[in-house]
């Protein structure tokens, strides 16, 4: 049923756009999508900005085992031209993604320490 598929696609795009409107100061990961998600993400970001949301200072990450043109341009480069940073990480998802998650969790745990605890541990 084409109408139902179209409605589902519109619903998904609205949901993605609502998340992108809150991306300021956050991180967007593109994991393994070489064509569709980079295009849809860039359109959702453009819509959010055109609606007046401030979405400039954030980080984007393209994680894939091969570099592709669209993610490099539509995830790493163009979205962060007004601020923020973009990264491309090349490697196998099953290795890189768990390592990246562990690094983020470790960094978050370090920032949760109070200044007193940090001095005592130094």
Which positions does each model-derived feature cover?
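C-terminal functional extensions of proteins
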Residues: 6-9, 15-25, 34-122
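Active-site-proximal segments of catalytic enzyme domains
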Residues: 3
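Thr-Gly-centered strand-to-loop micro-motif
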Residues: 30-32
């Amino acid at each position: 049923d084409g109408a139902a598929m179209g409605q589902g696609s519109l619903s998904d795009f609205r949901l993605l756009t609502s998340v992108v409107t809150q991306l300021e100061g956050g991180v967007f990961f593109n994991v393994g999508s070489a064509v569709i998600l980079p295009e849809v993400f860039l359109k959702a970001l453009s819509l959010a900005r055109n609606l007046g949301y401030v979405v400039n200072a954030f980080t984007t990450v393209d994680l894939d085992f091969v570099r592709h043109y669209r993610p490099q341009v539509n995830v790493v480069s163009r979205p962060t031209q007004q601020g923020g940073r973009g990264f491309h990480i090349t490697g196998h998802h099953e290795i890189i993604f768990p390592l990246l998650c562990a690094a983020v969790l470790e960094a978050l745990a370090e920032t949760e320490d109070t200044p007193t605890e940090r001095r005592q541990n130094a």
